[in-house]
Amino acid sequence: MDKELLQSTVRKVLDEMRQRPIPLGVSNRHIHLSAQDYERLFPGHPISEKKALLQPGQYAAEQTVTLVGPKGQLKNVRLLGPLRSVSQVEISRTDARTLGIAAPLRMSGNLKGTPGIRLVSPFAELELPSGVIVAQRHIHMSPLDALILRVSHGDMVSVAIEGDDRGLIFNNVAIRVSPDMRLEMHIDTDEANAAGADNPHAFARLVGPR
């Protein structure tokens, strides 16, 4: 195989890889807890795994809490593990209206100036002073995925949701690159409902910047 043919073949393979479907993960409301807050809410009860998630080492725990806001509450909100350094609550816009909380759109971990909420477990209550957000839609990927897709950590891209009669293009999708991450797009339940993505055939496809 001559050099020109080899280069052409490589370009074709890479183009096909850039068009491959991106797995879609729909994130229902959930919480992340610090070790200190977990011990206050579940004293003497070790965190236990209910279901492994796609991202390595992450899982849905057996433990749940009730979120209590100024206007309402949401029960059976799942804890995701492992425990973190700072507690965080991720809800949808619809959830925020139910609770009566003005939760800002943020990337995970960007909690400065966010509202708090009361957490109620079967054993205790905890007033979280801050940490409630509506999560920015994003795509997790490895450095190799980023190289193939020609994107970098922190980029904003546009993504088409396909596999359903409705479909939708989402702009302002953040790229999150980490060596221990697998390729997966995360959207919340409001976004999934709008795109008709609440079915096993739905997937995402990168269509351009922003």
Curated annotation (Swiss-Prot):
Its EC number is 2.3.1.222. It catalyses: propanoyl-CoA + phosphate = propanoyl phosphate + CoA. Its cofactor is Zn(2+). Induction: BMC production is induced by growth on 1,2-PD vitamin B12 medium. Keywords: Acyltransferase, Bacterial microcompartment, Metal-binding, Transferase, Zinc. The keyword Transferase applies. Disruption phenotype: Unable to ferment 1,2-PD, impaired for aerobic growth on this compound. Zn(2+) 1 binds at residues 30, 32, 90. There are 2 Zn(2+) ions per monomer; Zn(2+) and CoA bind inbetween the 2 domains in each monomer. Its main location: other. The N-terminal 20 residues target foreign proteins (tested with eGFP) to the BMC. Formed by 2 beta-barrels, each is capped on both ends by short alpha-helices. Evolutionarily distinct from Pta (phosphate acetyltransferase). Bacterial microcompartments (BMC) 100-200 nm in cross section are formed during aerobic growth on minimal 1,2-PD-B12 or anaerobic growth on 1,2-PD-tetrathionate medium, but not during aerobic growth on glucose, anerobic growth on glucose or pyruvate-tetrathionate. BMCs can constitute up to 10% of total cell protein. This is Phosphate propanoyltransferase. The lineage of its organism: Bacteria, Pseudomonadati, Pseudomonadota, Gammaproteobacteria, Enterobacterales.
